[in-house]
C-alpha cells in the first residue's frame, strides 16, 4: 500500500505500478466461442461478444483469431493509466456525472462532487462538503466538514512540485469560484476566500481574504456569514 503522507512515495508508486488501458471490445465472429479468463471478462454468445479488461490482454487473444473475426469496436477513456478511478458505489455521497475521482480518495458522508470536478489520489472531502463544477483537488488536498469549494477553484496537490505539507482547508470554509490555494497553505475554520483569489500563505480562522496574492480584507461578520451560508438540502441524502 502506498504511503500517502510522502509525495515521493506517491510518485514512486505511480512510476512502478503496472500501467493499464482498460477497454471494452465488441467482437463479432461466425465461428468462435469466447469465455472469461482470470485476465478479462467476456459477455455474450452466438458470435457476438463483449470483452472487458486490459487492452493488451484482450488483443493478445483476438490477434490469434483475426481471420475468424468479422468486426470489432473498441471503447476506452485512458491510456497507460497508473491509478484507477475510485469505486464510489458504496459512498454515502452525491457524485454527479463527469466527476473524475482517482483511487485512494476519502469521501465522507453527505459530501457532494459536482460535474467536471477532478479529485486526485490521497485527497479528503469532509462530511457535508461540496466540490463544485470543474474544481480541482490535488494529491492529498484536504477539505474539512461543510466546506464549499467553488466552481473552477483549485486546491494544489503535493506532487510536482513536491511538497511535504498538503493544503488543509478546515471546517466551514467557503472558497469562491476560480480561487487558487497554493501548496502547503492552511485555511482556518470559517474563513472565506473570495472568487479569483490566489492564496499563497495561511489564512487565519474567520478571516475574509481577496486578491492576488490574497490579503485579509476583514473578519467574517454576521452579514458575510449570511451571504456564505450553505444549503443543507443540497447535501442531505437521508
From Swiss-Prot:
Top-rank EC class of the record's enzyme: transferase
Catalytic activity: (S)-2,3,4,5-tetrahydrodipicolinate + acetyl-CoA + H2O = L-2-acetamido-6-oxoheptanedioate + CoA
Keywords: Acyltransferase, Amino-acid biosynthesis, Diaminopimelate biosynthesis, Lysine biosynthesis, Repeat, Transferase
Family: Belongs to the transferase hexapeptide repeat family. DapH subfamily.
GO process annotations (BP): diaminopimelate biosynthetic process; lysine biosynthetic process via diaminopimelate
Name by which UniProt lists this protein: 2,3,4,5-tetrahydropyridine-2,6-dicarboxylate N-acetyltransferase
An annotated Gene Ontology molecular function: tetrahydrodipicolinate N-acetyltransferase activity
PROSITE patterns with a match to the protein in the record: HEXAPEP_TRANSFERASES
Pfam family, one: DapH_N
Family annotation (InterPro entries): DapH, DapH_N, Hexapep, Hexapep_transf_CS, Trans_hexapeptide_repeat, Trimer_LpxA-like_sf
Coiled coil: none
Gene3D superfamilies: Hexapeptide repeat proteins (2.160.10.10), Malonyl-CoA ACP transacylase, ACP-binding (3.30.70.250)
Pathway: Amino-acid biosynthesis; L-lysine biosynthesis via DAP pathway; LL-2,6-diaminopimelate from (S)-tetrahydrodipicolinate (acetylase route): step 1/3
Superkingdom of the source species: Bacteria
Role of this protein: Catalyzes the transfer of an acetyl group from acetyl-CoA to tetrahydrodipicolinate.
CDD domains with a match to the protein in the record: LbH_THP_succinylT
